[in-house]
């Protein structure tokens, strides 16, 4: 009886929920950090249980990408009254038995693809899915005091000095209202995960020319954090012509 009265009484204290939520979040983060190596060695179905716990966090958390067991992609697109085959591309991480990957890339994406696949050591590429899932790289950013997710377009893999390295390259639209918040999220991600990538770059078109920001540079990260709009950054001396 005393225990029931105590619990009931605690429910009347408005601050207690926030306290317990905070303590539970802190404890879960500590345990996950301590046991991450063991969790990674579990079978997929058991790892999924821990992934769901991570997703309950009040703040974004690092979660490993999972290779999809299978993936379905459209191979045809309707144009008016007719259907046409989608263009196919080689060297994608996921492909059919002929090594083809169907995708409709816009002008910017096509230009980025052409430049990146010609770089020395290029091996293969991955078009990051633009939907929620374990095989999609999602990066948190804040807009209007709310967490949202930006999903960079491309990951390019290359061989360098006998090792496989990865470049994150994201064509960035400047006309959207969330252009700067997304860029801030990418810069913050680059600050905390620079060791995982050879390059982390954002590409945008300014006055008909593609420009690129190296988000691994400290001066670029600092400028992004204090910028008032994204276009100014891509027009400044911090950016280079993308080539």
Swiss-Prot record:
Domain of life per record: Bacteria
Loss of function: phenotype: 3-fold increased sensitivity to X-radiation.
Single GO biological process annotation from the record: response to X-ray
Any further remark recorded for this protein: Encoded by the CP4-6 prophage. May be missing up to 150 N-terminal residues compared to orthologs.
Protein name as catalogued: Protein YagJ
UniProt organism field: Escherichia coli (strain K12)
Recorded name of the encoding gene: yagJ
